[in-house]
Every structure is written in C-alpha cells, then in structure tokens.
A protein has these predicted regions:
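C-terminal catalytic core of tyrosine-transesterase DNA break-rejoin enzymes
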Residues: 2-16, 124-150, 157
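Minor-groove-contacting beta-hairpin "wing" of winged helix-turn-helix DNA-binding domains
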Residues: 33
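Basic, Lys/Arg- and aromatic-enriched nucleic-acid-binding interface segment
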Residues: 1-14, 18-19, 28, 38-42, ...
C-alpha cells in the first residue's frame, strides 16, 4: 500500500521509492528529499496529506538510515533492479481485476518480433501523478519540478487531461450567439 501511495502522490520512480529511508522524510515540514537514481537530480517533494497520514502511522525506528519499505529495499539491493517489485505490483493489479495476467506474447516475426508491453505498470502512477497535478490546475513548471521532468516535451507525454478539467476550461467562454 505504501509504495503505491508514494508513487501516486509523488510520481517517483519505483527505483527511487525502493531506496527511501527515514532520513529522506521530514514529517514536520511534510517534505521528501532525495536524489533521483536515474537523473541524479536533487528533489524536494511536498508530501500530500494522505501520504503524510500513511507515513505518520508507520512505526519509526531509531536508525535514520533504515528503509521506509524494508522488503522492497532488500529486494532492490539484492537484485540491483526494481523488476521484482514492479512484477509484484502487476500481480496486485491482476488480482484486483484492473489488469490481465501477462501472456508474454510478441508482435511480428523473426528479428522484428517485439514483446507486447503492458499498458498497466507501476510507472503508470507517474503518469497519474502528473495528470492529477495538471488536472488540478497546477502550473506546468511546478508539476515538472514535483515529478522531476526536465522538459515540457517529456511532461506532455505524461499528462492526460480529463474531461472534467476540459469542461472547467471552457466554462468561462462567452456566449456569442
């Protein structure tokens, strides 16, 4: 539950969430501070109220270097990849009826054959976080900073504007008939 909430409310990659420790977390100021594994970018991310509530309820130990998600951390360190955690997320989605089980089907033949890519993965939470921020009216610059996107082009690929936001956008248009 915690890694899913963290992905949803921060847009962090699973590799970054897996390596979070208590010293990354400032609950008094509701800020998560880390260095992105992929970009080495230093990030300060405000913690959403629901995610803060989750962290507040976690039993904190005496070691600030202790991982927030010990089993995910151990798997990430042992495997040097977040693949097993991503696969576990997929199984949760299948069990919840939100995704179909992987079939390992390919498209094409011979050297041109490509594995079918799942449309639902942990990375989708990064898209969802970006879209939620944009649909809530957060500026592009602020959304990009929270998610960690360096360019508008990348941010656009992660943004999916919902119909409610589009309807709200056209409400102020004048009636010219």
């Amino acid at each position: 539950q915690g890694i899913i909430l963290c992905g949803l409310y921060t847009g962090l990659r699973i590799s970054d969430i897996a390596l979070l420790t208590w010293e990354n977390l400032d609950l008094d100021n509701a800020v998560l501070t880390l260095e992105s594994q992929k970009t080495q970018r230093s990030m300060d991310i405000p913690i959403a109220p629901r995610l803060k509530q989750y962290f507040d309820e976690l039993p904190a130990g005496d070691d600030p270097a202790a991982p927030l998600f010990p089993s995910v951390y151990a798997r990430r360190i042992a495997n040097k990849t977040s693949g097993p955690t991503s696969a576990q997320f997929r199984k949760i989605m299948v069990k919840a009826g939100l995704a179909e089980a992987r079939t390992h089907n390919t498209t094409g033949k011979g050297r041109g054959a490509k594995r079918e890519v799942s449309k639902l993965s942990f990375h989708c939470l990064r898209h969802t976080a970006t879209s939620m921020l944009k649909n809530a009216g957060v500026s592009d610059a602020v959304a990009r900073d929270i998610i960690g996107h360096d360019s508008e082009a990348i941010s656009r690929q992660y943004t999916h504007i919902d119909m409610a936001a589009k309807r709200k956008a056209i409400e102020p248009l004048p009636d010219i008939y």
